[in-house]
């Protein structure tokens, strides 16, 4: 990769980080509530946000789609929601895992952790663990809330309650710091969830986005739409020289030339930045997103 490409890569990487920061702020706009130890409960809280963001976070703007999905499945009255299902389909078809790469607060949290200096390890040999998130989706998000119910027919949100580290990071910890009653009620389950959070934090420092790759059920849902979405990655075979720089740059362990729109692709753009021949580009609705150089050429020729 030449000096110019490296500079461009760094510039785009900074822009992506800025987008992630803005998305996280908009998803958690009620920051003063963090000091008060109470949850925002306005009308907009019924609207789902695109990424994994705990409803119980005092600063949260909206609802977590996975939490809302479990609430419906575990309800004694309703087992299906056109709103939640439509939400997943709409975002899945339009943005897919671009949400994971640019808009998810917990994805950004893992990115920041991975920037901590130290030895890093590849997850290429751990690819079978990718399927774990689909098992978690089916078992903890769907089956357990649906069939393991109490005396009045209500099921617990098993993923949120027993697995999700975001709930501890954004919900339990800030709420307990600002509310004495909640702090005194914390018990074994909180300790167990803290252990999960610590494990994810340590793994995120060593590996790139372990939670996204192996555990996240929201990523599992969005991945189902990766090959049919409006937003995809286009590899121009006529320009590709087979240098494999794109796959080397991909931290999601994808063979970009063979499967550019693999279910694991989070549309981060690392492969686009790494390609020395400009053979890889974003496409939206079949139209290639013009690069800066192409736009300048078009203006010059007018």
Where are these regions (language model features)?
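Non-ligating segments of multi-cofactor redox enzymes
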Residues: 1-257, 263-302
């Amino acid at each position: 990769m030449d000096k110019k490409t490296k500079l461009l890569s760094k510039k785009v990487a900074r822009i992506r980080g800025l987008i992630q920061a803005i998305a996280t702020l908009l998803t958690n706009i009620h920051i003063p509530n963090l000091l008060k130890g109470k949850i925002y409960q306005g009308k907009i809280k019924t609207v789902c946000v695109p990424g994994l963001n705990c409803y119980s976070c005092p600063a949260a703007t909206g609802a977590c789609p996975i939490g809302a999905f479990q609430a419906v499945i575990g309800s004694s009255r309703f087992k299906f929601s056109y709103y939640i299902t439509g939400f997943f389909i709409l975002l899945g078809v339009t943005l897919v895992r671009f949400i994971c790469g640019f808009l998810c607060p917990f994805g950004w949290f893992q990115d920041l952790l991975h920037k901590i200096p130290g030895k890093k390890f590849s997850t290429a040999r751990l690819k079978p663990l990718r399927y774990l998130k689909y098992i978690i989706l089916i078992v903890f998000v769907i089956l357990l809330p649906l069939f393991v119910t109490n005396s009045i027919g209500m099921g617990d949100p098993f993923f949120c309650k027993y697995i999700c580290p975001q709930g501890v990071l954004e919900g339990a910890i800030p709420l307990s710091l600002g509310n004495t009653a909640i702090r005194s009620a914390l018990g074994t389950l909180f300790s167990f969830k803290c252990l999960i959070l610590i494990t994810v934090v340590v793994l995120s420092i060593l590996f790139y986005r372990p939670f996204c790759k192996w555990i996240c059920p929201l990523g599992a849902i969005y991945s189902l739409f990766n090959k049919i979405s409006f937003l995809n990655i286009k590899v121009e075979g006529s320009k590709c020289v087979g240098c494999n720089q794109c796959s080397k740059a991909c931290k999601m362990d994808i063979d970009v030339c063979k499967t550019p729109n693999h279910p694991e692709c989070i549309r981060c753009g690392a492969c686009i930045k790494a390609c020395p021949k400009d053979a890889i580009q974003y496409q939206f609705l079949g139209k290639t997103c013009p690069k800066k150089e192409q736009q300048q050429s078009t203006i010059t020729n007018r």
